[in-house]
A protein has these predicted regions:
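Structured mid-domain segments that build the active-site/substrate or prosthetic-cofactor binding neighborhood
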Residues: 232, 236-240, 337, 343-454
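Feature activates predominantly on carbohydrate-active enzymes
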Residues: 40-43, 52-60, 64, 68, ...
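Acidic, His- and aromatic-enriched active-site or binding-groove loops in soluble protein domains
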Residues: 281-297, 325-342, 419-427
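Acidic, Ser/Thr/Pro
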Residues: 577-825
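Short, well-ordered secondary-structure micro-motifs within conserved domains or adaptor modules
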Residues: 74-96
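Aromatic-lined carbohydrate-recognition surfaces of secreted/lumenal glycan-active proteins
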Residues: 292-317, 357-363, 398-400
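Catalytic domains of carbohydrate-active enzymes that cleave complex glycans
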Residues: 413, 420-651
Length: 825
């Protein structure tokens, strides 16, 4: 039905009535009443809008209600609230309240009123969510539209988002075929922003806008090795700071609708080396000084406008100066310098800045290649923990770089939208996940719950034939449970995703001509499934060939080449029989493991009661990178743990490596000792004092610069190496592990070459460079002894024996229950 064209924006009588209605909605304590929207396929209420700007969302509401009930809902414009009423006359609560809305049913009407048209749009999709509509992933396949010819609603809510900006965006961008459905998914899940916070690298843009000024004033540029040059400023120069402040004022004058401007440094190094800049302090202090000056000038002329800046790379460490109240610092969860953990970084910035944002990395195709559980966006525990924690730490803006890969990460992205709006939803993850499984898969929810557990990065599964075999078998089981047409379409999408994982596994494991052939098969396949959004086709096509020089695209097959002439691009679609064949062949070709993983306790104790023999001492590799835990034991307290540390082995510019000591007996799980290792490639004595006995965790965090930790021979010192807690060993290493009595199979996963030695030092298995599971029988009488990995590269994840590695028996810690049980035998 066409909309009424009467213009209502200037009708003062209507505005007064709506304001009175809002007063009643926000102040009344009366209980909401049930309202009937439709009965037996007949609409009982019209949709009424108070503002012409609400026409698009009114049309969407009418369309969706028709799909749900079968009824045609008339759309009217009126000065008097009635029916399903949409209004924007909300009390003005400022920039932070642009998305606030209220929904209330009662007196035969349903009222949706918001601060802005944007807020009313949120209210409409919230109402539809409460009715049962879901848009789990982008596109019609992943819509869930309930069938309710008779529709009743009872609701009384006032909503405001916990994060003012909620962006889940795709690095590398979207295919044109995916842009509209992705935007639709964001809107339908309230994953849009009331405030636009700009925080990207900006120094280069300033230089471009004022090219003549910089040419006339080279002293505005950074002094590097005696030469004034881009891409950084000489921030100590007051004239430069005035220029940048004027630049900001000019931008706001040009576009008064701007909420913010970014003055984040250009990427990489090149910071000024002049004496005056050195006096200011760190790269962070310099960048923040400039942002503060800009904010001071902008606030005077344009109150309430924001200046955005990242805490990223060389300017990620916390500053020594406070941020201006209108400077919003978005802390990046990757590319952290200075050896800080994310927790330390947040605490440091929270102490200096009024408002924080988070620059997240839910999925970066270069890192995770759309594989199961490989990205943060597919790690439900990470999302459940971090989104409310960041908010508690002062974050009010969330920008999450992601990928258009709803195969591995779709459930995580969907749950993230719920938590970004309301962090309390983190407590409801299980019920939200069950809602997803019930509505998306119906009778097939049981096998699909198991399928999604394989995708969950909380307990990531190694990429292997076993994983593929289990995925295919669960899909086959789900398809056999009488799925309806809508559910079958979703299962088909996930079958195509599983086929992608299979093809990628074959490609990644191949060499020579076989690798090129597997690469071609992979790329031809991903183009055929591009509209499903299961994998990020644009990112793979643009990035993978540039990273892997052992393969090549043929002539005219680059991403930028026209689709019509690209020999690897086809518009064909897979048939139902072809998809069924993928599943059948996958079950046949991908064999399952012959062992069950065993869970061991986390309370470790010395293995001395087992009276294990002396063995040649091994080694733990050449260095560590990132964060690694060492486990040690204090027999008698107080004690001093003495180690030797060398940092900056690979990158000497990442700041000090940090060493923290955590006794497990400390009630609040706090560190009791801290040491920082300068990145000078020199040996430094580390002394960590503790007043606690028993098990201690030594955490070393070095920002991936490369750090070597050494300890005296015979000191209890063990590494845990499981899929949940990888040891992250570098170089060739030789470490021992214990095979408990009664063990029949040593099972696990290997990521590189090396040898497995039995208790007498005999090689019983040779590991290949290709990642994969291993299953080694334990001969009679060889259990209850030390085995070892020798000349090993990459990680070994132990799954049927305790995942505890040490240089010899004297340094080995084992799960308490294993020692107690085997010592009695």
């Amino acid at each position: 039905m066409p909309l009424c064209e009467t213009h209502l924006g200037s009708d003062q009588r209507m505005r007064g009535m709506i304001r009175a209605l809002i007063f009643l909605l926000t102040c009344s304590s009366l209980r909401a009443e049930s309202v009937i929207l439709a009965k037996e396929g007949r609409a009982l209420l019209p949709i009424v809008l108070s503002d012409d700007r609400l026409k698009p969302v009114a049309n969407e509401l009418a369309t969706m209600l028709r799909r749900i009930t079968g009824a045609e809902f008339a759309i009217q414009s009126s000065v008097e609230p009635h029916g399903i009423f949409l209004g924007v006359e909300f009390p003005d609560r400022g920039i932070n309240a642009r998305e606030d809305y209220t929904i209330r049913s009662g007196k035969g009407q349903v009222t949706l009123v918001g601060q802005t048209p944007h807020a009313v749009e949120h209210a409409v999709w919230d109402l539809l969510y409460r009715i049962g509509f879901r848009q789990f992933f982008p596109g019609r396949t992943w819509e869930v539209v309930p069938h309710s010819p008779s529709l009743i609603i009872e609701v009384d809510v006032s909503e405001s988002p916990d994060y003012h900006a909620r962006k889940i965006w795709a690095g590398f961008g979207h295919l044109k075929e995916r842009e509209a459905v992705y935007g639709e998914w964001n809107r339908r899940n309230r994953a849009t922003s009331g405030i636009t916070l700009n925080s990207g690298h900006s120094y280069g843009a300033v230089m471009s806008r004022h090219e003549a000024t910089f040419a006339a004033h080279p002293e505005f540029l950074a002094l590097v090795e005696g030469k004034r040059q881009k891409p950084k400023f000489c921030i100590a120069n007051a004239g430069l700071r005035n220029l940048v402040a004027d630049d900001a004022l000019a931008q706001f004058a040009k576009d008064p609708t701007l909420d913010s401007i970014s003055y984040d440094p250009s990427d990489g190094g090149g910071w000024c080396e002049c004496a005056e800049c050195r006096k200011i302090g760190s790269a962070t202090d310099r960048a923040l000084l400039l942002a503060n000056d800009v904010a001071e000038a902008v606030t005077a002329a344009y109150p309430g406008r924001l200046i955005g800046m990242y805490a990223y790379n060389e300017h990620s460490p916390p500053p020594s100066i406070a941020a201006h109240p209108n400077v919003v610092i978005s802390v990046a969860t990757g590319f952290i310098r200075g050896g800080y953990t994310m927790e330390q970084l947040l605490a440091g910035w929270q102490a200096k800045a009024k408002t924080l944002g988070i620059r997240e990395y839910y999925s970066v195709n270069t890192w995770d290649r759309d594989l199961p559980g490989a990205a943060r966006g597919g790690n439900l525990e990470y999302l459940r923990t971090t989104i409310p924690h960041f908010h508690q730490s002062g974050a009010r803006f969330m920008s999450a770089e992601s990928s258009d890969n709803f195969g591995p990460n779709g459930l995580g992205y969907y749950l993230a939208t719920r938590m970004m709006w309301d962090v309390k939803e983190a407590k409801n993850i299980d019920s939200l996940t069950n809602d997803f499984l019930d509505k998306a898969f119906g009778a097939a929810r049981a096998p699909m719950a198991k399928f999604y557990s394989l995708l969950d990065g909380t307990k990531r599964q190694a990429l292997s034939d076993d994983l593929l075999g289990r995925m295919y078998r669960l899909l086959d089981e789900a398809r056999g449970l009488g799925a309806d047409e809508a559910t079958q379409a979703r299962l088909d999408d996930l079958a195509l995703y599983t086929r992608y994982v299979e093809l990628y596994h074959d490609y990644a494991s191949a060499q020579g001509k076989e690798r090129q052939a597997a690469f071609e098969q992979l790329f031809r396949f991903i183009w055929l499934i591009r509209q499903s959004g299961m994998v990020h086709v644009k990112a793979l096509w643009r990035d993978l060939p540039n990273r892997d020089r052992s393969v090549a695209l043929p002539e005219l097959a680059r991403y930028s080449d026209p689709d019509a002439t690209n020999p690897w691009k086809s518009d064909e679609a897979f048939t139902a029989e072809q998809i069924s064949a993928f599943i059948r062949d996958g079950m046949t070709n991908r064999k399952l493991l012959d062992f069950e993983p065993i869970a061991f306790g986390s309370k470790l104790v010395p293995a001395t009661e087992l009276k294990l023999p002396e063995v040649p001492r091994g080694n733990a590799g050449i260095y560590l990178r990132g964060v690694r835990d060492f486990w040690t034991w204090i027999e008698k307290q107080p004690a001093t743990i003495t180690l030797t540390g060398k940092a900056g082995i690979i990158y000497p510019t990442c700041g000090h490596a940090k060493v923290d000591l955590y006794p497990l007996a400390e009630a609040e799980s706090k560190a009791v000792a801290h040491f920082e290792i300068p990145p000078d490639k020199a040996d430094h004595v580390i002394e960590l004092k503790t007043a606690f006995p028993g098990l201690h965790r030594i955490e070393v965090s070095d920002g991936t610069q490369g750090t070597l930790i050494s300890w005296p021979d015979g000191m209890p010192m063990t590494l845990v190496s499981s899929q949940e807690q990888p040891a992250k060993l570098f170089g060739r290493w030789h470490l021992y592990f214990y095979v408990p009595k009664g063990t029949k199979i040593i099972g696990g996963f290997s990521e590189g070459g090396g040898f497995l030695l039995d208790p007498v030092g005999k090689t019983v298995h040779t590991f290949l460079d290709k990642p994969g599971y291993f299953s080694i029988p334990v001969p009679h009488g060889e259990d209850g002894k030390l085995w070892s990995f020798k000349h090993s590269a990459g990680n070994r994840f132990l799954m049927t024996v305790p995942p505890c590695l040490a240089r010899d028996a004297s340094e080995l810690l084992l799960p308490e229950e294993v020692v107690a049980k085997d010592a009695r035998r």
